């Protein structure tokens, strides 16, 4: 996926991992309580809906319906991996994020129970707007909405120092306001 931008191969690789994890852990330990589908995407990535649906369905089928969740990242102005820039101009708008994730949730909500958006790629003054949209969409599709409060600082030229607690508090308070 990282090289091609196409999620379809993720299904082929991960179906064996799901089987192995269930055989070695899920079927043996009561503490195995659900699944994290680890394909971290941001937007309307080619094949993402089909890949997440196939992986979520396989996880649920093999485990008799245990919960599944995903943790995508928001394609904000701090999504600058592989560059020397601190921010970028072509970040996703709240409206475009809502449109794209409405389509994605529509295609996966029957096999993905929860979504925990990573918050590290958006600015602090954008937290409320994005978190509100995320919660609204999750509610629309009967999914749980969590937050993935990233604890490293993207506002520094050195990548990635631990975040100051005041910044973490801003993230947690924004998540609380969103519900």
Predicted regions: what is each one?
Residues 1-179:
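Glycan-processing catalytic domains of CAZymes
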């Amino acid at each position: 996926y990282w090289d091609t931008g196409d999620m379809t191969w993720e299904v082929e690789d991960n179906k064996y991992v799901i089987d192995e994890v269930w055989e070695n852990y899920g079927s043996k330990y009561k503490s195995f309580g659900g699944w994290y589908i680890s394909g971290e995407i941001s937007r309307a990535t080619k094949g993402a809906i089909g890949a997440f649906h196939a992986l979520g369905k396989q996880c649920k089928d093999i485990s008799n319906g245990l919960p599944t969740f995903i943790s995508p990242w928001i394609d904000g102005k701090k999504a600058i991996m592989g560059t020397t820039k601190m921010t970028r101009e072509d970040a996703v708008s709240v409206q475009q994020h809502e449109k794209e994730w409405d389509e994605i949730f529509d295609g996966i909500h029957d096999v993905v129970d929860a979504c925990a958006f990573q918050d590290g790629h958006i600015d602090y003054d954008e937290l409320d707007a994005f978190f509100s949209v995320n919660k609204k969409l999750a509610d629309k599709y009967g999914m749980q909405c969590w937050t993935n409060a990233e604890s490293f600082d993207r506002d520094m030229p050195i990548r990635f120092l631990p975040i100051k607690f005041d910044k973490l508090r801003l993230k947690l308070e924004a998540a609380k306001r969103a519900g």
